[in-house]
């Protein structure tokens, strides 16, 4: 059996300092590695009050520097926010400096309110209907 941990730098309210949240998150990642978990996942979120997670590659690079075995996954990178060449470069570099530990998750995002802030006018649900076209373009 394999175990995985999806964790964000999240807080329920602003009574917790984000540096404490970050420290606690790293401790959870290290405990997961020590406990034999095979993947830890970091998300991409923008302008949400509960979290600071604008770039999962930055979070995973930090975790890579503090771990040695656990695989590092993006859960997920929002395809609509990235140019494909930049995205490929970010993923390739993280995989290189982490010793080949990247698990790459690409998706359409979670919240329309993030799209409203990041890509005004683009509906998150529109991306759900273009997966066949995306699959063809990746072949």
Label every PLM stretch briefly.
Residues 103-109:
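Non-cysteine beta-strand/loop elements that form the S-adenosyl-L-methionine
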Residues 111-121:
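Acidic/polar active-site rim loop that often engages polyanionic ligands
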Residues 39, 101-103:
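Residues at the N-termini of beta-strands
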Residues 80-92:
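Glycine-rich anion/phosphate-binding loops
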């Amino acid at each position: 059996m394999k175990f995985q941990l999806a964790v964000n730098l999240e807080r329920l309210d602003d009574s917790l300092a984000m540096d404490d949240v970050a420290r606690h998150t790293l401790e959870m990642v290290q405990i997961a590695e020590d406990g034999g978990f095979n993947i830890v996942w970091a998300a991409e979120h923008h302008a949400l009050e509960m979290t600071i997670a604008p770039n999962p590659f930055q979070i995973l690079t930090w975790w890579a520097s503090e771990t040695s075995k656990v695989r590092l996954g993006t859960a997920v990178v929002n395809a609509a926010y990235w140019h494909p060449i930049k995205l490929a470069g970010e993923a390739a570099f993280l995989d290189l400096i982490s010793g080949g530990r990247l698990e790459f998750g690409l998706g359409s995002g979670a919240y329309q309110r993030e799209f409203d802030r990041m890509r005004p006018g683009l509906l998150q649900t529109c991306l759900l209907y273009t997966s066949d076209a995306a699959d063809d373009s990746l072949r």
